[in-house]
């Protein structure tokens, strides 16, 4: 009769554990509707509670909502795990020490009756990845992201440099000072100083032109000299060629002595 009072799809009534839907099947017998109920499959709430929740863990999604509402800056991280850890560290001071029962959720130790409070089961951490070492780094990264986004939202200053402020020294001086500054532009064209400057400039231009002309004349003179020397060399080569041809003709006309071979076999070349 006790087994008929509990619904397999609804929460258990009068149970000491939290009122949440939980499967009451054993791990090895789930998904086998053909087999009949065996003794010990469904037990009384008080007697079977420790053995029923050995391989199960309850997940409370309200912790994620509370943590994101309490710490809005962590929304930029898109990391619910670190947000939940951050919220649990802030609430650890007022929650008090917790006692982990072997068959049920953690309950706070303290005077007076207290309602059972769920404790979310965290994933296993490795030896090198401790929650205490990763959480400060993540919080610092989130803070840097918030600062960078806040700075990006502010209007940027203009890149062009502002014109320098006018100082008292740069203000135009009245009277003779203004006339003096105006006189620095140059002497009058009819003044003798202007004529002297023009004459000096003309002399410098003439000297540079004369120097360029002299260089051009020197190069032309060298070109003429080299051309004449080249012509002489060509004439010398032609003279030597004619002398060689005359010597060959002379040696061909010489009579052959008796102790020398015939002229047809001997070649002066």
Swiss-Prot record:
Modification type N-acetylserine: residues: 2
Alphabetical keyword list: Acetylation, Activator, DNA-binding, Isopeptide bond, Nucleus, Transcription, Transcription regulation, Ubl conjugation
Positions with biased composition (Basic and acidic residues): 177-201
Region (Basic motif): 195-222
Composition bias, Pro residues: 155-175
Region Disordered, residue ranges: 1-48, 97-133, 151-219
Cross-link (Glycyl lysine isopeptide (Lys-Gly) (interchain with G-Cter in SUMO)): 120
InterPro entries listed in its UniProt record: bZIP, bZIP_sf, C/EBP, C/EBP_chordates
Subcellular location: Nucleus
bZIP domain: residues covered: 191-254
Region of interest (Leucine-zipper), ranges: 226-254
An example Gene Ontology biological process: inner ear development
Superkingdom of origin organism: Eukaryota
Keyword 4Fe-4S among record annotations: no
Protein role: Transcription activator that recognizes two different DNA motifs: the CCAAT homology common to many promoters and the enhanced core homology common to many enhancers. Important transcription factor regulating the expression of genes involved in immune and inflammatory responses. Transcriptional activator that enhances IL6 transcription alone and as heterodimer with CEBPB.
Complexes and interactors: Binds DNA as a homodimer and as a heterodimer. Can form stable heterodimers with CEBPB. Can form stable heterodimers with CEBPA and CEBPE. Directly interacts with SPI1/PU.1; this interaction does not affect DNA-binding properties of each partner. Interacts with PRDM16.
Family of the protein in this entry: Belongs to the bZIP family. C/EBP subfamily.
Protein name: CCAAT/enhancer-binding protein delta
Organism listed in the record: Homo sapiens (Human)
Lineage: Eukaryota, Metazoa, Chordata, Craniata, Vertebrata
Gene: CEBPD
């Amino acid at each position: 009769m006790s087994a008929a009072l509990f619904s397999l799809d609804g929460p258990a009534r009068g149970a000491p554990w939290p009122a949440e839907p939980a499967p009451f099947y054993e791990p090895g017998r789930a998904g086998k509707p053909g087999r009949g109920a065996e003794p010990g499959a469904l037990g009384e709430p008080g007697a079977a509670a420790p053995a029923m929740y050995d391989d199960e863990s309850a997940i409370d999604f309200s912790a994620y909502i509370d943590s994101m509402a309490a710490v809005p800056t962590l929304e930029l991280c898109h990391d619910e795990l670190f947000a939940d850890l951050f919220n649990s560290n802030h609430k650890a001071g007022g929650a008090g020490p917790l006692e982990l029962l072997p068959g049920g959720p953690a309950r706070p130790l303290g005077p007076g009756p207290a309602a059972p409070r769920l404790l979310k089961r965290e994933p296993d951490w490795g030896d090198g990845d401790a929650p205490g070492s990763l959480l400060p780094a993540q919080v610092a990264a989130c803070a840097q992201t918030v600062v960078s986004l806040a700075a990006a939202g502010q209007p940027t200053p203009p890149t062009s440099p502002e014109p320098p402020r006018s100082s008292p020294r740069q203000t135009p001086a009245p009277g003779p000072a203004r006339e003096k500054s105006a006189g620095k532009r140059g002497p009058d064209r009819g003044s003798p100083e202007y004529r002297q400057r023009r004459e000096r400039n003309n002399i410098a231009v003439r000297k540079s032109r004369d120097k360029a002309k002299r260089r051009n004349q020197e190069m032309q003179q060298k070109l003429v000299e080299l051309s004449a020397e080249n012509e002489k060399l060509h004439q010398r080569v032609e003279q030597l060629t004619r002398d060689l041809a005359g010597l060959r003709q002379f040696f061909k006309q010489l009579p052959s002595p008796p102790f020398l071979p015939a002229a047809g076999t001997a070649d002066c070349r």
